[in-house]
């Protein structure tokens, strides 16, 4: 392996795929076009979505790009770690209904091992659990070590987003350490520790997922790949972090020179150097793509990056404006790849300079005031700065809250967010536009974690489903409030609650909070980071204020159904250990009022017999009508009692043990029914693999189980009615019908062959010659598959030397076949080329050998145009 610069890697990649027939497209702007779902382009395929969805026709079916991307979701970590960045480049090769796995996998291996010359013994491949096709191609068309291929589940190797196109993926990884990874479990460990580094993801978009969750095969599958350029450069240069990569290090060295310091000597200074280096790359690209600083949307992202970088310049002791001086270094390293940087060099510098000057006018005076605030707090031995003072900095001096928090954090000081949010209602929209944290009913999740620690909330809902309590906290519109009124959504925190907060895989309770003239629906219940129980509410009547007494009532029926499913999960766990083996352990679960999901360790799918045994064992236990007994004890006492605990869960001094007869004993903080008999019925709905060594069972209980069985019974009745037989005779009747259908298929095939033979004489009468080579062509109707091939064979045998090209419209689509005698193949004829070119005209694709090939198309109206083009293609092929 030879060292390669970042720019060399990019060029090598794009050139390689150009040599494979790809059109090299320049990077799209980081500003999305006609895509309101994105603030900024954050992935290589994002600008190509219209081509993948069919809304637009791509300029070529094979495309390769290196795309500029901006991601700010982890902005707080940028600089503090050596791998986070807001700007990165994503290389990709894409196929829009052209090639597929057979081509892209060998190409990926060829580029990795022959162009980049990465040592094969350092390379590891992951594929989707059930993707045998990918495994066969990896092992037959490349020389990858089969022991270096690991199968993983959906979470790692299957790409889908709701309904629509989706598919499995295959990733290539570089192992940094010596030795060999011997198992999927070890591989996951090494990957999590950044020792096995994923550098290329090949996504095989071969399914269309419908609203019912069915995966339907796409007629023309797509390829979407992504290789992070900076990450690949770290591998090629043998460095650990992106900030050591040649082009990025060059920019960092420029920043260090301006700060009169050296990278690697002081970690605090290194953080600032990394932040400035990354942020200047981002802002240069954003400005070159016409983003300007503002107080909303992507303009606010730009402003925040600029001001964060400027502030870290101050920390490094850099005097005056300086960010614009680094732009030359950015352009020097990236200008060839992105000429817009060169073209707009002066413009970029000017925008940065103006924004930096504006901030400089406020930051010096703001810093002086903040310094006074900090000194005053330290003098009085206090650790909380009032929200009023923080708001004054923000409102009067343009000091972003994030910047104030960051500076205070370095001094161990926090902000009184309660009073700050009261002062800042009118500024909420600005903050929301820039934040990436998810929201619930208009409430910023981040604010939940600022509930004062002295506010205590107690869960009293194991025995009580309703109780009186006092309102201690109200949050609405991203701020703490004194009251909440009819029509408003928000959060209510009380000192006691019967509502179970989502935890341990169990969904949160729903219900109501009420008082005289007041009613609110509790739509969810969660814990904040500090363990406070918060109720997400929508007020339907009246209003409530802090310290008011309220009645909290849990939806009893829903809680009972959740309890049935949770208790059934414990029984399922115990049954699996008895039927499958003691190696079975829970690796995840989800319980709501309708169903349960249980993930467990096991290395193969369960047989029908095993599933039946598990289901029967759970139902036998339900019939035993054991009480569900709960008891608090120490963790040691619990373990001595035989209780199962989850190794990755954290437990306190006292734990809650849930026991169901002699069948199941587990540590659990969730809610359950009082007796296993109340579960009623347990029914397994599905069993599947989600990762190597991890299986998933989904099941239903009680009335939902009855509904499931009734639905299956209804289906059987409908099928029996359609087949005109009794339910017990369905299988025999289906076997009989299959046999009859096979006989009919043979008859139809024979008739089609006869029909096709009727065209034989006409085709032979109209044989043409192209440069001395006989050419038999025809456009037919309703001649498909075997009949079309048989007709082609007959004509080829009769003309002895020459080419036969036939096209036929069948059920709204087009089929093509081409055949050639060996002597004309030696003259340059290639059937694969012929069908590929004519299939394009009919909106399809295909290929094959020089002497025989077939293809398909979806535009029957173009059949004659396609067949008429054969003569021209032959003119170019025949030597």
Swiss-Prot record:
Primary residence: cytoplasm
Any matching Pfam family: DHHA1
Co-factor: note: Binds 1 zinc ion per subunit.
Record field: catalytic activity: tRNA(Ala) + L-alanine + ATP = L-alanyl-tRNA(Ala) + AMP + diphosphate
Entry cofactors: Zn(2+)
Catalytic EC class: ligase
GO biological process: alanyl-tRNA aminoacylation
SMART domains, per the entry: tRNA_SAD (SM00863)
Molecular functions per Gene Ontology: alanine-tRNA ligase activity; aminoacyl-tRNA deacylase activity; ATP binding; catalytic activity, acting on a protein; transferase activity; tRNA binding; zinc ion binding
EC number: 6.1.1.7
Domain of life: Bacteria
Location of this chain's protein in the cell: Cytoplasm
InterPro entries: aa-tRNA-synth_II/BPL/LPL, Ala-tRNA-lgiase_IIc, Ala-tRNA-ligase_IIc_anticod-bd, Ala-tRNA-synth_IIc_core, Ala-tRNA-synth_IIc_N, Ala-tRNA_ligase, Ala_tRNA_ligase_euk/bac, DHHA1_dom
Domain remark from Swiss-Prot or TrEMBL: Consists of three domains; the N-terminal catalytic domain, the editing domain and the C-terminal C-Ala domain. The editing domain removes incorrectly charged amino acids, while the C-Ala domain, along with tRNA(Ala), serves as a bridge to cooperatively bring together the editing and aminoacylation centers thus stimulating deacylation of misacylated tRNAs.
Record-stated family: Belongs to the class-II aminoacyl-tRNA synthetase family.
Protein name in the entry: Alanine--tRNA ligase
Organism of provenance: Clostridium novyi (strain NT)
Gene: alaS
């Amino acid at each position: 392996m030879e060292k390669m610069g970042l720019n060399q890697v990019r060029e090598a990649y794009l050139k390689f795929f150009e040599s494979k027939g790809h059109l090299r497209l320049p990077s799209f702007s980081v500003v999305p076009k006609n895509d309101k779902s994105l603030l900024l382009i954050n992935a290589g395929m994002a600008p190509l979505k219209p081509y993948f969805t069919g809304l637009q026709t791509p300029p070529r079916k094979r495309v390769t790009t290196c795309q500029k991307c901006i991601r700010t979701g982890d902005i707080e970590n940028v600089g503090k770690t050596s791998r986070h960045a807001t700007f990165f480049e994503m290389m990709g090769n894409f196929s829009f209904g052209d090639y597929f796995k057979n081509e892209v996998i060998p190409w990926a291996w060829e580029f990795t091992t022959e162009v980049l010359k990465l040592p094969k013994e350092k390379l590891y491949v992951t594929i989707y659990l059930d993707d045998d096709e990918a495994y066969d191609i990896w092992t037959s068309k490349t020389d990858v070590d089969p022991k270096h291929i690991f199968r993983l589940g959906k979470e790692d190797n299957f790409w889908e987003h709701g309904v629509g196109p989706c598919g499995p993926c295959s990733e290539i990884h570089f192992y940094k350490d010596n030795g060999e990874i011997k198992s999927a479990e070890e591989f996951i460990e090494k990957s999590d520790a950044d020792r096995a580094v994923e550098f290329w993801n090949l996504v095989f978009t071969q399914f269309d997922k419908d609203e019912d969750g069915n995966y339907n095969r796409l007629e023309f599958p797509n390829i979407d790949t992504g290789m992070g350029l900076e990450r690949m450069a770290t591998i090629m240069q043998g460095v650990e972090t992106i900030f050591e990569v040649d082009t990025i290090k060059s920019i960092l060295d420029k920043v260090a020179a301006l700060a009169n310091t050296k990278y690697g000597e002081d970690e605090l200074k290194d953080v600032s150097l990394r932040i400035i280096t990354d942020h200047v790359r981002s802002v240069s690209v954003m400005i070159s793509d016409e983003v300007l600083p503002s107080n909303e949307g992507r303009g606010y992202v730009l402003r925040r990056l600029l001001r964060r970088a400027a502030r870290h310049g101050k920390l490094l002791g850099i005097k005056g404006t300086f960010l614009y001086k680094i732009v030359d270094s950015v352009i020097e390293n990236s200008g060839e790849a992105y000429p817009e940087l060169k073209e707009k060099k002066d413009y970029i510098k000017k925008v940065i300079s103006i924004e930096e000057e504006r901030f400089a006018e406020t930051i010096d005076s703001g810093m002086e005031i903040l310094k006074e605030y900090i000194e005053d707090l330290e003098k009085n031995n206090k650790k909380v700065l009032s929200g009023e003072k923080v708001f004054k900095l923000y409102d009067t001096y343009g000091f972003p809250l994030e910047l104030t928090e960051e500076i205070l954090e370095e001094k161990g000081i926090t902000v009184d967010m309660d009073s700050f949010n009261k002062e800042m209602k009118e500024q909420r929209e600005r903050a929301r536009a820039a934040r990436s944290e998810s929201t619930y009913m208009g409430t910023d999740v981040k604010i939940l974690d600022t509930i004062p620690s002295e506010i205590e909330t107690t869960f009293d809902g194991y025995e009580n489903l309703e109780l009186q309590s006092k309102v201690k906290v109200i949050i609405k519109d991203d701020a703490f409030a004194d009251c909440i009124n009819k029509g408003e959504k928000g959060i209510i925190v009380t000192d006691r609650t019967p509502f179970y907060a989502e935890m341990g895989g169990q969904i949160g309770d729903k219900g109501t909070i009420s008082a005289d003239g007041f009613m609110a629906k509790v739509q969810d219940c969660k814990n904040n980071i500090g363990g406070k129980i918060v109720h997400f509410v929508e007020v339907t009547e009246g209003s409530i204020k802090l310290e008011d007494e309220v009645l909290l009532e849990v939806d009893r029926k829903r809680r009972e159904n959740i309890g049935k499913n949770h208790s059934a999960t414990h029984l399922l766990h115990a049954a699996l250990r008895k039927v499958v083996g003691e190696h079975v352990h829970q690796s995840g679960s989800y319980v709501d009022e309708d169903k349960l999901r249980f993930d467990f360790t096991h290395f193969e799918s369960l047989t029908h017999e095993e599933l039946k045994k598990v289901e029967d064992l759970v139902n036998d236990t339900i019939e035993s009508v054991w009480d569900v007994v709960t008891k608090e004890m120490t963790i040691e006492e619990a373990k001595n009692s035989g209780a199962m605990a989850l190794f990755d869960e954290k437990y306190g001094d006292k734990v809650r043990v849930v026991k169901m007869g002699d069948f199941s004993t587990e540590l659990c903080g969730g809610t359950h029914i009082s007796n296993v008999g109340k579960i009623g019925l347990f029914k397994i709905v599905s069993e599947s693999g989600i990762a190597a060594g991890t299986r998933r069972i989904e099941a239903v209980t009680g009335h939902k189980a009855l509904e499931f069985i009734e639905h299956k019974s209804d289906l059987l009745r409908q099928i029996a009615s359609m087949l005109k037989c009794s339910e017990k005779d369905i299988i025999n009747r289906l076997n009989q019908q299959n046999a009859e259908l096979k006989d009919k298929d043979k008859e139809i095939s024979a008739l089609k062959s006869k029909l096709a033979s009727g065209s034989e004489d006409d085709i032979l009468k109209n044989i043409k010659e192209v440069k001395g080579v006989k050419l038999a062509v025809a456009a037919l109707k309703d001649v498909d598959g075997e009949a079309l091939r048989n007709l082609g064979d007959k004509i080829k045998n009769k003309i002895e030397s020459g080419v036969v090209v036939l096209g036929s419209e069948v059920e709204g689509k087009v089929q093509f076949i081409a055949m050639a005698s060996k002597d004309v193949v030696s003259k340059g004829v290639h059937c694969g080329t012929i069908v590929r070119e004519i299939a394009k005209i009919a909106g399809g694709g295909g290929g094959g050998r020089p002497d025989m090939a077939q293809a398909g198309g979806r535009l029957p109206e173009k059949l004659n145009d396609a067949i008429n083009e054969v003569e021209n293609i032959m003119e170019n092929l025949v030597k």
